[in-house]
Amino acid sequence: MFDNLQSIKERHLDLERLLADPDAAGDQTRFRKLNKEYSDLREIVETYDRYSHIKKQLEDSRQLLKNEQDQEMKALVEEEIEELQRQIPALEQEIKVLLLPKDEADSRNVILEIRAGTGGEEAALFTTDLFRMYQRYAEKQGWNFQMLDYNESSVPGGFREATISITGHDVFGTMKYESGVHRVQRVPDTETQGRIHTSAASVAVLPEAEEVDVEIRKEDLRLDTYRSGGKGGQNVNKVETAVRITHMPTGMVAACQEERSQLQNKERAMKMLRAKLFDIQLAEQQQARADLRRTMVATGDRSAKIRTYNYPQSRVTDHRIGFTTHALPQFMQGEIGELIDALKMHDQTERLQAAQQ
């Protein structure tokens, strides 16, 4: 696994020279591609440089120990050798993880879908809670979080479903572990006997697709317009600005009502539809791989119960990795980074074990 590190370092230097060329920015498509490759390799090269530096220090210290006569100096050198030896395994592990094949979709933006499941009005309120949790997490990450479409429930403040666009750095690579069924246990405000009710919401995280990723024929689409309930000034409920697009071969539907014009809503609905079709395409490719890993973390199985939010115990438990926190209020305020980091680490460990078999 370490054999190609030197060639990676040489490629990184080549890219640095190419990007420094004043003519490089002339072709923006090529420039962005080179810049992304440079960024992807930088962390590997920097970690490898630290590793090489420590290995050199270790070699020098061992040589010094052989020639040193002073006992106090020998003791100091032995301490230094011990400390350097402690650092090497962690760096080796870090390099192995960095060398794992990257999921090309990780750098993409996301279409996030949250839908109320079992539990009636309480499920709709929980869907809103999840919406706000992800909105606050996106703000902390510096991402752009934009509502695309929603269906309100009969209970004030509740969503039957919501569709959101999230754009920023490595959004899919961070959010992909959220796909699945989220279960909540709490006492509803309307419950007079104090009984705990269980309800659920499903989350789907779809990587945003480019036009080149998915071929969509115009004749396969049905476009319907309707009156928007969203923003739009005087147009609201007067002009049919909202758009619903149906992909006839698959039955996939995408709708948008949040923009002010029908054209803008159509563009966003097409973006949502491309993401849905691209997600099907990616799932088929993954299923076809001989090395398909069958863990829920890896597959993002949306029918799988992945997490429980227990309000009486102020507890959040992720069932895939056995992670538990008793800081539920903070978690619902978007403090979900610790869990996402743990899920990433678990995924990397599994992939590393598979690569070494």
Curated annotation (Swiss-Prot):
Keywords: Cytoplasm, Methylation, Protein biosynthesis. GO terms for cellular component: cytoplasm. It comes from the Bacteria. Methylated by PrmC. Methylation increases the termination efficiency of RF1. InterPro entries: PCRF, Pep_chain_release_fac_I, Pep_chain_release_fac_I_sf, Prokaryotic/Mito_RF, RF-1. It holds the Pfam family RF-1. Its main location: cytoplasm. It is found in: Cytoplasm. One of its GO terms (molecular function) is translation release factor activity, codon specific. The modification N5-methylglutamine is found at residue 234. Peptide chain release factor 1 directs the termination of translation in response to the peptide chain termination codons UAG and UAA. Belongs to the prokaryotic/mitochondrial release factor family. This is Peptide chain release factor 1. It comes from Chlorobium phaeovibrioides (strain DSM 265 / 1930) (Prosthecochloris vibrioformis (strain DSM 265)).
